[in-house]
């Protein structure tokens, strides 16, 4: 809503089949964030700050510190903590790319706080940690289409679980 930029047209044709419809209880906030675009968001915030006007106020809504002065994961979490205000629709594309396992767990707690404030998340992820969010509807997408899948039946959960429980065997097979 406030930032629209593209360094490359990289969206899939899936967007041609999606339609967001606003109901009577519409979101008052929203954000679409790809882990790999965090750098561009940080650069735009810095540009707005240096251009004067409301730039300083805008910077405060992202934590008051340049996101470039933080690690990738810290800046991603700063966006979620400071910019996501509740009563929103937040669309995140592979946030685990920026986050360590412990930060993914911190993200679950932050999501819970925002969900309790009437927010909704749509997340594209390969992370079994993020998929574990209680009562999440997990839609698994593969070459045959998409389907609702229980958490422990997802491909990513099963593969990660198998690897962690059979590490030596898996490493021998892989190497």
Regions found by a protein language model. Give the residues of each.
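C-terminal lobe/lid and adjacent interdomain/linker elements of RecA-like ASCE P-loop ATPase modules
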Residues: 102-120, 127-175
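GG-anchored amphipathic helix commonly corresponding to the ABC/SMC/Rad50 NBD signature/C-loop
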Residues: 62, 66, 70-92, 102-108, ...
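Short, well-ordered loop/turn elements at secondary-structure boundaries
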Residues: 27, 85-86, 118
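Conserved phosphate-binding elements of NTP-dependent enzyme cores
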Residues: 12-14, 18, 66-67, 78, ...
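Conserved P-loop NTPase mechanochemical-coupling segment
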Residues: 42-70
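Short loop immediately C-terminal to the Walker-B catalytic DE motif
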Residues: 96-97
């Amino acid at each position: 809503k406030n930032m629209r930029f593209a360094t490359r047209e990289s969206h899939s044709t899936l967007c041609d089949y999606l339609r967001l419809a606003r109901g009577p209880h519409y979101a008052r906030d929203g954000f679409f964030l790809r882990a790999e675009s965090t750098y561009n968001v940080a650069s735009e915030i810095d540009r707005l700050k240096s251009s004067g006007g409301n730039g300083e106020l805008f910077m405060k809504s992202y934590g008051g510190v340049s996101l470039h002065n933080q690690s990738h994961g810290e800046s991603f979490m700063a966006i979620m903590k400071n910019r996501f205000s509740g009563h929103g629709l937040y669309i995140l594309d592979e946030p685990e790319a920026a986050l360590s396992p412990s930060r993914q767990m911190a993200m679950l707690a932050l999501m819970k706080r925002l969900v309790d404030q009437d927010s909704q998340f749509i997340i594209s992820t390969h992370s079994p940690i993020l998929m574990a969010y209680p009562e999440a509807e997990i839609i698994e997408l593969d070459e045959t289409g998409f389907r609702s899948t229980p958490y422990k039946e997802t491909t990513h959960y099963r593969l990660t679980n198998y690897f962690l429980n059979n590490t030596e065997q898996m490493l021998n097979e892989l190497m």
